[in-house]
């Protein structure tokens, strides 16, 4: 739960029409426009002993993000690289692994190169992201305004202090995985162009290029 400590069951008594009306009011009802509540920071332990920072929005802000995702996803899916499998509908890590095995067996490929993007979610450039959205055809200024507000939502740390983010998109947000795919889509196509003769599969966060021995 976010800083309001509420979850989906807390609004379960409302009818669908009431939920839609509430979301509409949150986004457009104020003269200042949409203002998401602070995102709650929570550190999740990782197997290597480090922690993964999550940013958990309040329940109504999560619903706003879900609405945005349902608008953006079909537009983006039509323009994403076919080599990308992470955070996409009807695709998964298992699909990427299966494709890798198929290529290894059928195309006389013998090695895999893997690389990772360290701290990706925490370092997304907001201006670059908005430009990439625009180039994908997402050009509704009201929608972009709301997404900017989501990216700039203050982060409430465990000690109660507030941080104003200038980069990054919080892991834990509904639309963060989709925004990540928008940012990395250009890289997906660039990697494919550099290794045209050798196929690749992307399980988001890690790139695997499969090739032949010399």
Name the predicted role of every residue range:
Residues 1-17:
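Non-catalytic, polymerase-adjacent accessory regions of viral genome-replication enzymes
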Residues 1, 70-83:
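Charged boundary/loop elements
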Residues 22-31, 101:
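Inter-domain linker/hinge segments that demarcate the starts of reverse transcriptase
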Residues 53-54:
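Conserved phosphate-binding loops in nucleotide/dinucleotide-binding enzymes
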Residues 38, 42, 79-83, 88, ...:
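Conserved polymerase palm-domain catalytic core
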Residues 63-72, 179-183:
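Active/ligand-binding-proximal structured segments within catalytic/core domains
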Residues 42-50, 72, 163:
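Residues forming anionic-ligand binding surfaces in small-molecule and nucleic-acid pockets
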């Amino acid at each position: 739960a976010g800083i309001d400590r509420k979850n989906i069951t807390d609004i379960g008594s409302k009818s669908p029409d009431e939920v839609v009306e509430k979301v509409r009011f949150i986004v457009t009802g104020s003269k200042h426009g949409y203002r998401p509540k602070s995102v709650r920071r929570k550190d999740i332990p990782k197997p290597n002993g480090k922690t993964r920072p999550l940013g958990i929005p309040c329940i109504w802000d999560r619903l706003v993000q879900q609405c945005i995702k349902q608008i953006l996803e079909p537009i983006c899916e039509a323009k994403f690289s076919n080599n990308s499998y992470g955070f996409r509908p009807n695709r998964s890590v298992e699909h990427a692994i299966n494709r890798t095995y198929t290529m290894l067996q059928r195309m006389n490929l013998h090695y895999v190169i893997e690389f990772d993007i360290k701290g990706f979610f925490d370092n997304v450039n907001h201006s670059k992201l908005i430009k990439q959205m625009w180039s994908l055809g997402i050009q509704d200024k009201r929608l972009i305004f709301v997404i900017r507000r989501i990216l700039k939502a203050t982060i409430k740390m465990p000690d109660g202090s507030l941080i104003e983010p200038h980069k990054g998109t919080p892991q834990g947000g509904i639309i963060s995985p989709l925004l990540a795919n928008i940012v990395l889509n250009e890289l997906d196509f660039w990697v494919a162009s550099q290794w045209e003769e050798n196929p690749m599969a992307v399980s988001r966060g890690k790139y695997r290029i499969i090739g032949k021995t010399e």
